[in-house]
Regions:
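Histidine-centered catalytic micro-motifs
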Residues: 4-14, 38-41, 131-135, 195-197
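Metal-associated gating/positioning segment near the N- to mid-region
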Residues: 13-48
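Histidine/acidic-residue-rich catalytic or RNA/ligand-binding cores of hydrolases
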Residues: 15-18, 47-51, 140-147, 167-183, ...
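Extended substrate/RNA-proximal surfaces in nucleic-acid metabolism proteins
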Residues: 29, 42, 47-159, 214-223, ...
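Residue-level detector of anion-binding/catalytic polar loops
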Residues: 34-35, 156, 190, 219
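His/Asp/Glu-enriched short active-site or ligand-binding loop at hydrolase and phosphoryl-transfer sites
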Residues: 156-169
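C-terminal active-site rim and adjoining tail of enzyme catalytic domains
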Residues: 162, 181, 194, 198
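Short acidic/histidine-rich active-site segments
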Residues: 189-203
Length: 242
């Protein structure tokens, strides 16, 4: 499978990543990607940047080291209604938004129903484009319901390659993805593969994700990574680059 993009990455601005924006873009260019996306953690993540950071993306060149760049965010889902940690004013200024559950940012004692409702609620927000790493058994959800809702609301579900790595802190990712991806095939839900890179060497590292898709015989037509125009159908700012 041709893999042209990586939209879930972090730089030093996120507080626990280790390279600059220019270094990450350089790595993406060297690895032959056609598009690089930077998605810093939104403010509720301990140590991340202030919300004002997301209001000044106009100063950033949209081609860096020869590769087109999108500037987005990884929002934190804060409660079981799907509330997130950047206001609409900021979301309208950025290129795209990923919304994810993170253990430091939400009650860790919820039920499957609670976390499912969190995902379903956030998908009703038209300014959110991708659901990040829906795979963590510490924050379990009804993955079939999540896949069905993503198809209904025209959201991309992320297959996070880092979640599948042996050193990942997320629990049960492969088993959860097997359920989620099976449901995606049932409902025709599109997915995006991302690295979740916090260091330049991991930009575009989608190896674990590709292995899982091959094991499941997942249809390539439901993966947006081989086609920028296919991804642009979910991310309007990308359409403006084509």
């Amino acid at each position: 499978m041709i893999d042209l993009l990586d939209l879930h990455t972090h730089t030093i601005a996120s507080g626990h990543a280790y390279n600059t924006l220019y270094e990450m873009a350089q790595s993406a260019a060297e690895k032959g990607l056609a598009l690089y996306g930077c998605s810093e953690h939104a403010p509720a993540m301990p140590g991340s940047c202030h919300k004002f950071y997301f209001s000044n993306f106009d100063v950033i060149p949209r081609v860096i080291r020869g590769i087109p760049v999108l500037m987005g965010t990884e929002l934190n889902i804060l409660d079981h209604t799907g509330r997130v940690d950047l206001e609409e004013h900021y979301l309208q200024k950025i290129d795209y938004a990923i919304a994810s559950l993170h253990t430091p940012c939400i009650d860790n004692h919820g039920t499957v129903s609670d976390y499912t409702n969190a995902y379903l609620g956030v998908m009703e927000n038209p300014l959110i484009h991708i659901i990040g790493h829906p795979d963590d058994s510490r924050l379990p959800a009804d993955w079939t319901a999540v896949a069905a809702a993503a198809a209904k609301h025209h959201k991309l579900l992320e297959l996070n390659s880092h979640s599948l790595a042996p050193n990942s802190s997320r629990k049960g990712a492969r088993e959860n993805y097997e359920q989620l991806l099976t449901a995606c095939m049932r409902y025709g839900t599109s997915i995006i593969i991302d690295s979740d890179a916090h260091c330049e060497n991991d930009v575009g590292n989608h190896e674990m994700a590709h292995r899982l898709l091959a094991d499941l015989h997942f249809p390539e037509e439901l993966v947006v990574n081989p086609s920028l125009s296919k991804a642009a159908a979910f991310i309007p700012s990308l359409a403006r680059l084509l």
